[in-house]
A protein has these predicted regions:
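Short, surface-exposed beta-strand/loop "edge" segments at domain boundaries and coil↔beta transitions
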Residues: 13-16, 62-64, 82-90, 200
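Short proline/glycine- and acidic-rich turn/helix-capping motifs at secondary-structure junctions
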Residues: 44-47, 109-118
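Short, intrinsically disordered low-complexity segments
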Residues: 24-86
Length: 209
């Protein structure tokens, strides 16, 4: 599941306010970057690009998308289906900065609860029984979650567990292996996931403590 916000562009008797360039969009929040296009393309108005993926290196764990919906004459912001509190704080700061520029409104923000969205996203992934693993694109690398990981994220401290899990997996020195550690009754289960010839492999080891 994905949550989308719209911020209508300002309208006047002279017509629609000039659409921001992708570069100007990134300048709304200090440190915000995008590597969706070469720098020369970022000078174009946002509506000439399909979308840009944004993040703050060193803070963000996941990317969020920004685009321009011509039909609605509005800026569109898509949340990733899984994100951390810091990711949400960055996105919210971006929404507020864009709102200050347009002077209109943020459609979809009223009644939005970040933690409820997180829980609903986890439930949606767990409902996909055909998938053994959930793969989310992190800021640099894909991040893998087993069903056991996802179930643990529904516990009382599930969001904190999710954030710790993401930080741990991002510290892996290579893209080739992604360990997932699960503690249960003195037993540590380590799933080592790796990519080889475009195929996904998994090895499960048990360490008794």
């Amino acid at each position: 599941m994905t949550k989308t916000f719209f911020i209508p562009n300002k309208q006047s008797i002279l017509g629609e306010q000039e659409i921001l360039t992708a570069k100007s969009i990134l300048a709304l929040v200090d440190g915000l970057e995008s590597h969706s296009y070469d720098a020369i393309y970022l000078r174009q108005p946002l509506n000439r690009l399909e979308y840009i993926e944004c993040a703050i290196v060193g803070q963000s764990q996941f990317l969020f998308k920004v685009s321009y919906a011509d039909g609605q004459k509005a800026y569109r912001v898509d949340l990733p289906d899984l994100l951390t509190k810091i990711d949400w704080q960055i996105i919210k700061s971006f929404l507020e900065a864009l709102l200050a520029y347009t002077g209109t409104e943020i459609e979809g923000l009223d009644g939005f609860d970040f933690e409820a969205y997180f829980q609903a996203s986890i439930q949606a992934h767990l409902a996909d029984n055909a998938a053994r693993f959930t793969i989310c694109q992190g800021i640099f690398n894909p991040v893998f979650f087993s069903h056991e990981d996802l179930k643990s994220f529904l516990e009382e401290d599930g969001l904190a567990q999710f954030e710790a899990c993401v930080r741990f997996k991002r510290q892996m020195p290579t893209l080739q292996k992604f360990p997932s550690i699960r503690m249960e009754k003195g037993k540590c289960t380590v799933f080592t996931i790796w990519l080889k010839a475009s195929r996904l492999f998994c090895r499960e080891n048990h360490l008794f403590l």
